[in-house]
A protein has these predicted regions:
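N-terminal active-site beta-alpha-beta segment that forms phosphate/nucleotide-binding
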Residues: 2-98
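Fold-independent oxyanion-binding glycine-rich loops
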Residues: 8, 24-26, 52-54, 76-78, ...
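A generic local secondary-structure boundary/capping motif
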Residues: 61-62, 84-85, 108, 138-145, ...
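Conserved acidic residues
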Residues: 71, 148-150, 183
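ATP/pyrophosphate-binding catalytic subdomain of soluble kinases
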Residues: 91, 96-169
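Conserved small/polar residues in nucleotide/adenosyl-binding loops
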Residues: 152, 202-204
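ATP/nucleoside-binding phosphotransfer catalytic cores, i.e., glycine-rich phosphate-binding loops
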Residues: 177-202
Length: 204
């Protein structure tokens, strides 16, 4: 089965306003920049975006913030985006700041079909507000929900025509688990190779 499409605009054609998206990458590494550019061109809005970070002003998710296409961010680090800061302080953007390890596990849980889990991270802080608390082995833990997305956009090093992917170096941080947590995953690859080439190296 050939899962390759002509370009990023075709790949994202079924993404609509109001959907929840996961976008891979760690810092500025492994970001699906062509998919993000296509979303900017399409002009859809009211998006909920799940990403480790919010990009910078002129790259990554920063481009979608500039065009006011994001309604809510679920993220762990947002410190290098002045437009993000401006929108949050002006009450124009909803934000759910999640500890990085918790965000990673929420995404992994969503992809594995696990609806919720308990973690001690965040107990006794604002992170725990409104969440169920239980004690395990004398340690208080809060319940966190698994995360899913309507679509996930990832960036891979290599991919084949069947959709198998290999991620390289730091790009392996969030891309593979996000690929599992999206109902539909769209991957842009640096190199497209014939089926059977990747063999046992496949990550997803």
């Amino acid at each position: 089965m050939n899962k390759v499409v002509a370009n990023a605009d075709v790949a994202i054609q079924d993404i609509k306003s109001g959907m929840t998206l996961m976008l891979g990458g760690f810092g500025l590494c492994g970001i699906p920049e062509n998919g993000i550019a296509a979303l900017v061109r399409k002009g859809i809005n009211n998006l909920t975006c799940v990403s480790n970070n919010a990009g910078v002003d002129d790259f990554g998710l920063g481009l979608l913030l500039q065009t006011r296409q994001i309604k809510k961010m679920i993220s762990s680090y947002v410190g290098e985006n002045a437009e993000f800061e401006r929108q949050v302080l002006a009450g124009e953007l909803e934000i759910d700041l999640v500890p990085q390890g918790t965000l990673s596990e929420r995404i992994r849980a969503g992809g594995a079909g696990i609806p919720a889990f308990y973690t001690a991270t965040g107990y006794g802080t604002e992170v725990a507000e409104g969440k169920e608390v239980r004690e395990f082995n004398g340690r208080k833990c809060i319940m966190e929900l698994g995360l899913r997305a309507d679509f996930t956009l990832v960036k891979a090093w290599k991919g084949d025509y069947a959709g198998n992917l290999i991620f390289k170096a730091t790009a392996r941080n969030f891309n593979p688990m996000m690929a599992m947590a999206g109902k539909i995953t769209i991957a842009e690859v640096e190199e497209l190779v014939p089926n059977g080439t990747l063999l046992s190296l496949i990550h997803i």
